[in-house]
Amino acid sequence: MGKRVLVVGGVAGGASAAARVRRLDAEASITVFERGEHVSFSNCSLPYFLSRTVGDAESLVLMTPEGFKASYDIDVRINNEVCAIDRAAKKIRVRNELTGEEYEEAYDELVLSPGSSPIRPRSIEGVFLPHVFTVRNVNDIVKLDKYAGQEGKADVVVIGGGFIGLEVAENLREAGKHV
């Protein structure tokens, strides 16, 4: 049996790294851990769901865990968050977000690609209200779309002038919102 490679994070970087390891080593045992429920989705396409340039949310998902297994013989575990790394013992501790079960996995090589989390400064009043959204994954964009699609929700403020923020503003405008 080949070396045991664990990848923390299953979106763009982690999914690419896992596929690359497979191309370099056909014998490796590769497992990807993703804390969210989707793996390998198109981050850059998320805003285009708001204007229906991307027709449905599932079109944003490029590969499923089953697809990774069938195409690359890579085990992908969604809803599994890596909680701790023991570098000396070469083990990680993982928590299944659905069951709460925790377990350990040993590795020969570990790839870290955990992604990011949006910052919501606690000093800004109202930043955690239910009508304040962040856009990081498929679930986030679906929630924003559902809220923005309600009758009477015509005015939208987008905070963040990076590519995703600008594309969210553009696509909300395309969807008829005042941005």
Q: Can you name each region flagged by the protein language model?
A:
Residues 1-6, 66-159, 174, 178:
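FAD-binding core/adjacent interface of flavoenzyme oxidoreductases
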Residues 17-18, 42, 87, 121-123, ...:
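Short glycine-/acidic-enriched loop or helix-start segments at secondary-structure transitions
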Residues 9-14, 115, 160-165:
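Conserved phosphate-binding and hydrolysis motifs of nucleotide-dependent enzymes
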Residues 55-56, 121, 162:
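Alpha-helix initiation/capping motif
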Residues 2-76, 171-179:
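Beta1-alpha1 glycine-rich phosphate/pyrophosphate-binding loop at the start
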Residues 60-61, 103, 164:
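Residue-level preference for nonpolar/small residues embedded in alpha-helices
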Residues 13, 38, 84, 99, ...:
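Glycine-/small-residue-rich active-site loops that bind phosphorylated ligands and cofactors
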Residues 141, 166-169:
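Hydrophobic, well-ordered secondary-structure segments
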